[in-house]
Amino acid sequence: MKAEYGEIKDNYGEIRLFPESIDDLWHLQHLVSPGDLVFATTFRSVEGATDKIRPEKVEKRPVRLGVRVEKVEFSHHGVRLRISGIIEHGMDTGAYHTINVETGYEISVIRRWRPVDLERLDRAVKASVYGVIHILTLEEGEAELFRLRQYGPESVITITAGSGKGGETETRTGFFDTVIKSIAEVSGPMVIAGPGFVKEDFVRYAKNKNCAPAGRAIVAETRRIGRGAVQDVIGAGTLEKLIGDLQLSREVRLMDEVLLRISRDGAIAYGYKDVATAIEYGAVDEVLLADSLLRDRAIVPLIESAERMQAKIIVLSTEFEPGERLAALGGIAALLRYKMG
């Protein structure tokens, strides 16, 4: 994400945003809310004749519009963000319009920027400096490649011994060759993980085949493969050896701490009522919030109160297991400075 800050006074103002990836579009989904004013260049129909019954020509021209947001929808598969609302600035004022935001498309957002919004924006901007991380999970006869999005792992391909055409994966070397083909185009950081010694055998074989991604990969031990192995890798801090601090690593560690404190009846609060009470007493150190609650009208004043108490706000993606666990606890939890009675 690229961002250009305009004039911001008392946390209210304009920021120009340039999404560069699907991760950036996902961030925008949580940065743009109903009530915001969004400016963008879009296309509107312009009639080429004064005859309104049978115009000679109807063409679409680029125009800059300001839309008061009513709805925001993000599509992983369509790789776009739909921002819908009423036109307040530009042609056809009062009409309903949808801005389709794709990568490389500039928008300007005017709103009140909370600290949690600016933290997310800063994270999106910093994330653009390193390549997308891939994690290959591997055991005997089975492999799965994941692309690590900022909202969680995305499965790219699954390979099983004996599943290829012509039996090319029937043998161990044939299976390894198929896996090598699947990672050949990976250009960014990579981790190869799994239980046992198969991953080491694969890396040695792949290096002998001059497979560049395997040559620069970090090898990690996990108890399992698949999505569970990805969480093991993230939770162990392996990715921080590649790129430094990573939000997903922090999410795993924080939720582990939440569950540990719950099991020990420690300094923890979860669920709206208990967290609200803890904030009221100034006992909160960190608040964990599921991203699905960011626009909840009851949650917004609660988060604002926590920020006034100097508590840290960490938003967890519900598309990744730690966020799913948090959602099961009511979508909000707080690590406390001391245990409350």
Swiss-Prot record:
It is found in: Cytoplasm. Its cofactor is a divalent metal cation. InterPro entries: eFR1_2_sf, eRF1_1_Pelota, eRF1_3, Pelota/DOM34_N, Pelota_arc, Ribosomal_eL30-like_sf, Transl-rel_pelota. Its EC number is 3.1.-.-. Its main location: cytoplasm. The keyword Nuclease applies. GO terms for cellular component: cytoplasm. SUPFAM superfamilies: Dom34/Pelota N-terminal domain-like, L30e-like, Translational machinery components. Keywords: Cytoplasm, Endonuclease, Hydrolase, Metal-binding, Nuclease. Monomer. May function in recognizing stalled ribosomes, interact with stem-loop structures in stalled mRNA molecules, and effect endonucleolytic cleavage of the mRNA. May play a role in the release non-functional ribosomes and degradation of damaged mRNAs. Has endoribonuclease activity. This is Protein pelota homolog. It comes from Methanoregula boonei (strain DSM 21154 / JCM 14090 / 6A8).
